Amino acid sequence: MYKKRKLAILIALLTGTAAAHGQTDLNSIEARLAALEKRLQDAETRASTAESRAASAEQKVQQLTQQQQQTQATTQQVARRTTQLEEKAERPGGFEFHGYARSGVIMNDSAASTKSGAYMTPAGETGGAIGRLGNQADTYVEMNLEHKQTLDNGATTRFKVMVADGQTTYNDWTASSSDLNVRQAFVELGNLPTFEGPFKGSTLWAGKRFDRDNFDIHWIDSDVVFLAGTGGGIYDVKWNDSLRSNFSLYGRNFGDIADSSNSVQNYIVSMNNFAGPVQMMVSGMRAKDNDDRQDANGNLVKGDAANTGVHALLGLHNESFYGLRDGTSKTALLYGHGLGAEVKGIGSDGALRPGANTWRFASYGTTPLSDRWFIAPAVLAQSSKDRYVDGDSYQWATLNLRLIQEVTQNFALAWEGSYQYMDLQPEGYNDRHAVNGSFYKLTFAPTFKVGSIGDFFSRPEIRFYTSWMDWSKKLDNYANDDALGSNGFKSGGEWSFGMQMETWF
């Protein structure tokens, strides 16, 4: 009995505990579900927020991408513009100013005026120049204004005008004796994009000018060849890598240009060829009715003057001292017939006869002898026959030697020796008399420069100089209106002193 009661009590206790536990588990599950639902809501909220942020970020990325693309496009535009500006800046263009000038004073050993000039000897009338150092008292100025541009298509343009003046007076006010004139005014068109083949890279020109390929011997103030006038032509027609040609037509006037009735003009057609260092130039000219030309008073100027002529030049332009050592050198042989017998200034002498013949040889070079000594020899010789009168003869030769001794980077001693022999048989033309003989000149010139002492072609220079010259007595009798033999300037030795500036840029 006791055992049955105990079992009943145990069953009752177990049943109540299970019910209590069941109620407790249900409440716990509900709570857990509620918490889980809340967490899901929180997760959905966070996911929604994240999606919003992602959408916003994506929008910002798209905006940044667009901005970057715009920036890149702008950068590319700026780069292209910068490149264009740089290319434009690198193109040669704009205005340029160039010039040449010399001016000085000279006196004899009595502190009086004296004769001077590179063409002061009787041979000077036919181009026989002598050394110019310590032998010039004039003021001569050339001023060149140029405008250049390069177009987008690569074509180039160039305009140049040169104004020049020469004076022999020492006064500061010289308008009444001025020789001021416009010596050049021309236009060039280069690298035209429609030009092909041999004409690609060539240059067209027209106007009044000195030919681009003229060259001279500076120390004796003489052109080897000087082609100038008004006309037109083309430079640098390239047949191959080493052969190029220039073609031109120049016009010149003879006689008094102030005479409105003077219609005689000399037309010069020229072909100038270059094959490496070798130059071959051929020119033909015609001046219709030159033998009927009259002066301002209606008088016949020269009834036997030539109407036509030819001219030729063979030149060699070395980038060394005659192939022997460092330096430079140029050599030329010239021939002219008829109107071409004035071989230096092509087509400039209207008094030449149809049978006139002239040969000319010219050569000069520069080279250093040591670190402080530099030398520049030159030779110029000419033979002309039947020039103005049947049977006349003009023969002369000039040897010139200039030395520079560097003392400091700004001071040098310049030395020059010049010798000329002449045999002139004018046959009475223009009241000239037959003479032969020699002329000598020695010059010593302390010289100041800003640098490049050994460069014969660097300027400016300021020189102080003394010169001695003498000549054969027979040369005093050549003419009554030339320098040699004039009053106070006769053979027997002449001293001169002076100073001079010279510059070009």
Swiss-Prot record:
GO cellular component term, pick one: cell outer membrane
Query: Which UniProt keywords are listed?
Result: Cell outer membrane, Ion transport, Membrane, Porin, Signal, Sugar transport, Transmembrane, Transmembrane beta strand, Transport
Question: What subcellular compartments does it reside in?
Answer: Cell outer membrane
Q: What is the topology of this protein in the membrane according to its UniProt annotation? A: Multi-pass membrane protein
InterPro entries, sorted: G_neg_Bact_CarbUptk_Porin, LamB-type_porin_N_dom, Porin_LamB, Porin_LamB_sf
Where is composition skewed (Low complexity) in this entry? Answer: 46-82
Q: Per its UniProt record, what Pfam families does this chain match? A: LamB (PF02264), Sugarporin_N (PF11471)
The biased composition feature labelled Basic and acidic residues covers 83-93
Specify the signal sequence span.
1-22
GO BP term (any one): monoatomic ion transport
A Gene Ontology molecular-function term?
Answer: porin activity
Q: Where is this region: Disordered?
A: 44-94
Print the domain comment field: The C-terminus helps to anchor the porin to the outer membrane.
Instruction: Quote the PANTHER family the UniProt record gives.
Output: CRYPTIC OUTER MEMBRANE PORIN BGLH-RELATED (PTHR38762:SF1)
> What is the annotated role of this protein in its UniProt record?
Porin for sucrose uptake.
- Quaternary structure and partners: Homotrimer.
By sequence similarity, the record places it as follows: Belongs to the porin LamB (TC 1.B.3) family.
Q: What is this protein called in UniProt? A: Sucrose porin
Organism this protein belongs to: Klebsiella pneumoniae
